[in-house]
């Protein structure tokens, strides 16, 4: 199903990330005029495999650039809420073009987007070392420190690259980090020279971000927004402090792109059929025994950006209800349902209790969250390979029952079901 003829369609991660948003974005982007990123940086990551007329496969890796670029008729936009590491942007751009994907004239970057500098990446690593056993588990791409500079009103934005005062502002920013972390090895003047050289190459891509989006929406363009990370990593609503540094909720779409909330017509929540998480932080349904190991192996649960093993466990509908409440999903994309094919029984978390008392909502206090006793419902498995299913009617009855259980609990319909990694392994229910 294509994005709305007019207005904005948003695809958001509903758990802790790695739900498979890129695959749905790839499908929806085929009918989109504009595909936009609203938050995060090159800490997001997914790979799209495209088969040509001869059956030959080409893999395209996306980290910072919107994956809607796969559609040659789609324009990509990096919004004001994104933090941009310019060398990585051009490295990704050049890699895509070497593989035959023509991007020229189809990519635009908001002049208000903040810049990620080399020293941000160094500081990211220093902070992780400083935290030691309490490490959050960042990708060390400099995303957090860049957002920190932004929040402290000392950051540099894309438009600053063309300001004669850029070198002085850059030196001042580096000196501030030296005072905080000591004098780490960093070539300040070399970085300035590199960025000034990149500035001229970047110039044709730069637009007034809010005006660009306003004109797109008002002219009836079909806009697809590719959310980064997921709700449970949101700075305000995630398991703080084990979160990312940006707003990954529906609110981040509005602020990150500079659009009216009334422009948004569809919000698709992407939910994995079980739960995974990378890095530290609470994970109530995590399974450290056979179930977790099976999900990790069968689901090939390794981080796209870092290669780290993802922690695995049963689907947590308490998390999903909280996520649905905040983001207001109009439909769901249930991914990797095929990973559950081999289980005799499948558990689903339906509630939390602390000292025998049912918990309402999702606890903000991590000490309190650590005490929850997860309440599970047990559903029968289907023990059938569903990877070749093309329609909902082809699913085993127990797989249909699993989908319905999720829908009934959340009050939201499942629109798409992923049954394998391929682009064509996606069942559209309505």
Swiss-Prot record:
List, alphabetically, the SUPFAM superfamilies matched: P-loop containing nucleoside triphosphate hydrolases
Q: Which residues form the signal peptide?
A: none
Catalytic residue list: 18 (proton acceptor), 46 (proton donor)
Keyword Coiled coil attached: no
Record's keyword annotation contains Transferase = no
Question: Where, by residue number, does substrate bind?
Answer: 304-310
Residues annotated as binding Mg(2+) are 18, 45
Name the cofactor(s) required for activity, per the record: Mg(2+)
Residues the record lists as binding IMP:
18-21, 43-46, 139, 153, 229, 244, 308
Coiled-coil blocks: none
Pathway, per record: Purine metabolism; AMP biosynthesis via de novo pathway; AMP from IMP: step 1/2
Do you know which HAMAP family this protein is assigned to?
A: Adenylosucc_synth
Task: Tell me the protein's name.
Answer: Adenylosuccinate synthetase
* Organism name: Cryptococcus neoformans var. neoformans serotype D (strain B-3501A) (Filobasidiella neoformans)
